[in-house]
Amino acid sequence: MSTPDPPLGGTPRPGPSPGPGPSPGAMLGPSPGPSPGSAHSMMGPSPGPPSAGHPMPTQGPGGYPQDNMHQMHKPMESMHEKGMPDDPRYNQMKGMGMRSGAHTGMAPPPSPMDQHSQGYPSPLGGSEHASSPVPASGPSSGPQMSSGPGGAPLDGSDPQALGQQNRGPTPFNQNQLHQLRAQIMAYKMLARGQPLPDHLQMAVQGKRPMPGMQQQMPTLPPPSVSATGPGPGPGPGPGPGPGPAPPNYSRPHGMGGPNMPPPGPSGVPPGMPGQPPGGPPKPWPEGPMANAAAPTSTPQKLIPPQPTGRPSPAPPAVPPAASPVMPPQTQSPGQPAQPAPLVPLHQKQSRITPIQKPRGLDPVEILQEREYRLQARIAHRIQELENLPGSLAGDLRTKATIELKALRLLNFQRQLRQEVVVCMRRDTALETALNAKAYKRSKRQSLREARITEKLEKQQKIEQERKRRQKHQEYLNSILQHAKDFREYHRSVTGKLQKLTKAVATYHANTEREQKKENERIEKERMRRLMAEDEEGYRKLIDQKKDKRLAYLLQQTDEYVANLTELVRQHKAAQVAKEKKKKKKKKKAENAEGQTPAIGPDGEPLDETSQMSDLPVKVIHVESGKILTGTDAPKAGQLEAWLEMNPGYEVAPRSDSEESGSEEEEEEEEEEQPQPAQPPTLPVEEKKKIPDPDSDDVSEVDARHIIENAKQDVDDEYGVSQALARGLQSYYAVAHAVTERVDKQSALMVNGVLKQYQIKGLEWLVSLYNNNLNGILADEMGLGKTIQTIALITYLMEHKRINGPFLIIVPLSTLSNWAYEFDKWAPSVVKVSYKGSPAARRAFVPQLRSGKFNVLLTTYEYIIKDKHILAKIRWKYMIVDEGHRMKNHHCKLTQVLNTHYVAPRRLLLTGTPLQNKLPELWALLNFLLPTIFKSCSTFEQWFNAPFAMTGEKVDLNEEETILIIRRLHKVLRPFLLRRLKKEVEAQLPEKVEYVIKCDMSALQRVLYRHMQAKGVLLTDGSEKDKKGKGGTKTLMNTIMQLRKICNHPYMFQHIEESFSEHLGFTGGIVQGLDLYRASGKFELLDRILPKLRATNHKVLLFCQMTSLMTIMEDYFAYRGFKYLRLDGTTKAEDRGMLLKTFNEPGSEYFIFLLSTRAGGLGLNLQSADTVIIFDSDWNPHQDLQAQDRAHRIGQQNEVRVLRLCTVNSVEEKILAAAKYKLNVDQKVIQAGMFDQKSSSHERRAFLQAILEHEEQDEEEDEVPDDETVNQMIARHEEEFDLFMRMDLDRRREEARNPKRKPRLMEEDELPSWIIKDDAEVERLTCEEEEEKMFGRGSRHRKEVDYSDSLTEKQWLKAIEEGTLEEIEEEVRQKKSSRKRKRDSEAGSSTPTTSTRSRDKDEESKKQKKRGRPPAEKLSPNPPNLTKKMKKIVDAVIKYKDSSGRQLSEVFIQLPSRKELPEYYELIRKPVDFKKIKERIRNHKYRSLNDLEKDVMLLCQNAQTFNLEGSLIYEDSIVLQSVFTSVRQKIEKEDDSEGEESEEEEEGEEEGSESESRSVKVKIKLGRKEKAQDRLKGGRRRPSRGSRAKPVVSDDDSEEEQEEDRSGSGSEED
């Protein structure tokens, strides 16, 4: 063994390669993991020995057979004997031996292939059970001690025992092992090209052992010591499987794993650190300190391992300082490996037991394992095929046999293939393989080959050309591709830009949304402050917003309120000055006379005729101080005599509240008058010093005073004391500067006690009196405005000693009610009801002149008519009931009161202060306070913007609307007091209103459709002698005709007459159930009224048209309903009797039939609890007035208001217009909450709710069924059940009738002349138009007098005196005499004509009376009337203003339709003065009223077309007043000419007034017959159309006059 064999027969390669040798054994690569065992050692306990069928050969180190391992140990022993333990080859072989020790006794489990490879040798010829090279995947579980068979720890110093423990019996002895290690070390050094030292050569040859090798092994510590030694390791990890720890082990140099450090600078292996300089060589160091010092001795820097593709396992459980294995230092490429210097042999090295790193993946072993598995599968398949059953099918058995033989041939085929390959390799020579050209033979070129070469060259050129073309094509394709890429790039860029743009837009949208939210938040905050009346905060937010419009509105409001405040101050100062002047004048007169007559309590001298003589005078006993008041006190007229009879008494001094002011107060006021800047003086009670509430000495009175002041601080503008105490000159505080507390009613009021809210109203009225102001008491209808007025009068009489006279102007219908209330509440007040005939009124004149009365009650008509009597009295107070009658500033009543009557204090009573427009409200305020509210245009300019229906340039938003409405509330609040029933009268039952939609009958639908489309009414043709063929009749005022059709089609007389013939009735009148079948509203009444009568509910039924009331009377007679009727023709004295009869507890009348205008004012009908409004009024307040006849104080039951409305008709439009007008009223009046106690927050919340309510949808247009109607009219469940049973009984009864008909008329029941298509109606209409134009003969007209026979005053007088028929007869006789006179004058003017010709003319005139062609001239008017008309028109045309400009210049002639087409589109009836003059010449006007109508129409057209405030608009208003004044002047001149006696004066006045009324009542000649028929109980058809119109006073607005005139046909038909 002189020559050391290289282990495993590998040939060492020279060079610096650090890689392993060519051995394919266990040294194929290092294991990177911490476990030195195989992968099988981590998969659980090792299985038992292999089966007997698979004997395993004896394995040596590294998994090799024992014989191979024996060959490897021979060189190791020789190296050990030669003393070469330091040789690298020795260490390498020793490492191989240690690696094999790790696998000893731990053979891998048999693979699945081993169980089936029965007798088949391995194709590779190696061991079939080589250890798997798979690294351990789990970290170490901690240090474990290796134990022997007895469980005792093994000593690492005994290698033989270690080897036997690890590998079983081994053939190597100790010397052989040393020699093997030396050979391994030598192999390593030779592989690196390093020279072998002598001792290593000797050790390799086995001559002597390596120095230090003998000492190395015994000194090695056991593996447990190194594993558990101290050190700051990273913590224990899960160790490898149950395999024992490896022995001392050192990897060969250059084959270290990735975690091994490089060798040191002295060539010492990593586990053997060099000796420190200057010290002798030491033996093996003991303890871990040497291990810790080992890495510090290497000067090279340690480089961490490079990461690999596999996850590295956790580090071993060895402290880093004690670990002999360090990370390798990666050698940079290109750097030659420097040979390490040899270590001196005598150097003692410290050897530490290394820990085996896990092996890496071995691809050879993986391949082997794959082969094993294939072999196993093949063997398994052969076994399956051999064991196939014999019953298999033939073809399957053949296939299985073929497969079995093929599998058995596999090994033979593999052996044959190997042999063929070996033979082929032997044929290959060494030189041929190295140099292929060495034996190449040169070839000669022949001619044939030259041609071939040429041909090939040509082919080559073609090929080159083809390649060139192909290259060019590729170039073009690349260009196209580039273009495509270019487009794609820019498309992507564009897409990115679009995305960016979208993102920017989204950002801005989000930003804008956020900004909008912020603005909305600020706006809500602003609205909140505005609603809370936080004016300071609101102004700050307005300044932040920079809203010029809102700031401008606030500025305007401040300026306007400041101006009004100043005007109120001036008004009060002027009133005070007047009072002073009057008192001074009276005092001077008394001083001049030198004697003082008897002075009454009011400071006036007393006489027998004084109006103060009947009032009690308060007296006091001088000694006892006893005061006598009321009935115990003496009368004023008997005061002196009573004082003589009762000595010791004298007149009691008047209190401060009773006196209007003493002389000292007058002097103080004179001194204070030149100082307007000072706040108004506080009352005596408020001038007291308010004590400090924090002080201890606060009396009970002072505490109560403090509480009152705190209570007044709650509201903003009603806290007068608080405002004055702060020195704030608020508008309301200035107006109501003087306050007086009223706790109870006057002692003169008896038979009842005022409610608390009525006491508050009285206090407000007294405050108006004390502050010299006038106001509007606008409590809702039914809250007792009459009682509060009587309380004011009695309070003034008792406490202020103002005994009158008081003028109270009321409607005629409520005059009796006022007299009744005075008799009940204040019987001691002397009242005069100024009404009746002229003789009766004249009887009151002496009493009026003497002044022996306190109150005068009269009507609007007598105020105008008897102004020469009533205006002579100086009234202390003027009170106008239903003050909204003065809503037109130009109405006659307002002008007469302003010009003729003297009354320093005025009061208006109205339940509806705002009915249609804001100028109406201004008219009321102007009448009350003309010095404060001067200009209507200014008032409208300030407050009309939110309510203007046309001409509004900019729509106001909600906030601006609230600001403007709030401005109006500020203006109105001092002068208007309004309380609602729901606020002040809690015990008043609820009022519920329902709108019940009614369907139309077939007759109504047909008539309505043609009237709506063409404006014509279908007839049967009888008026044209085409009876039964049908015809049409054109009617004016289509809306009125549509309303009549909706109410009842029989309101048209010819329709009822035709249907009476069609249905078989005689007399032209329809009776029975066909009365209600023709109208949807009547059919609904037929279902409702029996239920109401059965449950004892009294009904008020309001109608607009008197002819409809007549038809309704026929229906009531048919059903047997007891009823009462009240309309405009009912006398005043009869009205009271009707009310009394209806209100009696046991009255048999359960229906009261009233007209809305006549029966809607001042009537107390609280015994009824159901109100049915048959047809709605254009003015919603008329309907509200009508409802409140039942819903007023004294009502005990819940009130149901049922408003009937025909579905899809003009009535829905009327209802919508009424709602709009009510909406205006809500915004202005109700939202102001002028009730003296509502706080600002409540007012703002109410206004906000109104504005939000506008956005709600309207109700659906559907006709309710019986159940829904029953729910509307039933008050409780029992009534509802009863009504449902009644409906069921009614339907059963109708079903039993064999001749039953539908509830409403069907189309198949209509006559043929009604059912016409549109084309036929168009043809009939054209025929009628042609007849009108060309005059085909005269039509038969009924004898109806259309002239104005009586004025309204004459008619009222005749009604009151009961001489209507006689006066009408006289008028007819006068007309006939005038007519004969005109005829005689015409005959005398033509004396040459014969009598015969004159008789013929008269006959022709009589014939022409029946029907005249349109082209024929009208009969001439009286010359006096024509002269008046011309005079009036000329005066209006020539009128000039102060600058000399003629106002009527633009009104003379209108521009043509071509010049101004929009005027004719907007104005339906254009008229000018030229046309008016022409009509006067053609005698078109039959009275001054007709002329006035056209002049007013001209002015209204100008106001409609032109903007408000323009020059033409203002001129038209002036021309209206000029016309009125000129007409009055001319009428007065006529009146003065005929005054000869008082009787004649009365007659002449009534005669002249016949042409001064704006609305005429047309009396038909058949009235007498009608009255007789009604007395007899029968009814003639003309009676339905011969009712007179309700009385409409001429103080109504022009707009309502026109509506009433246009509706005259509806009430007369």
From Swiss-Prot:
Binding to RNAs including lncRNA Evf2 leads to inhibition of SMARCA4 ATPase and chromatin remodeling activities. Residues 171-206 form the QLQ domain. Residues 162-177 have a biased composition (Polar residues). The KIKL motif recognizes and binds the NET domain of BRD3. GO terms for molecular function: ATP binding; ATP hydrolysis activity; ATP-dependent chromatin remodeler activity; chromatin binding; DNA polymerase binding; helicase activity; histone binding; lncRNA binding. This is SWI/SNF-related matrix-associated actin-dependent regulator of chromatin subfamily A member 4. Residues 579-588, 1577-1587 have a biased composition (Basic residues). Residues 1-177, 198-353, 577-610, 647-699, 1366-1427, 1530-1613 are annotated as: Disordered. The gene is Smarca4.
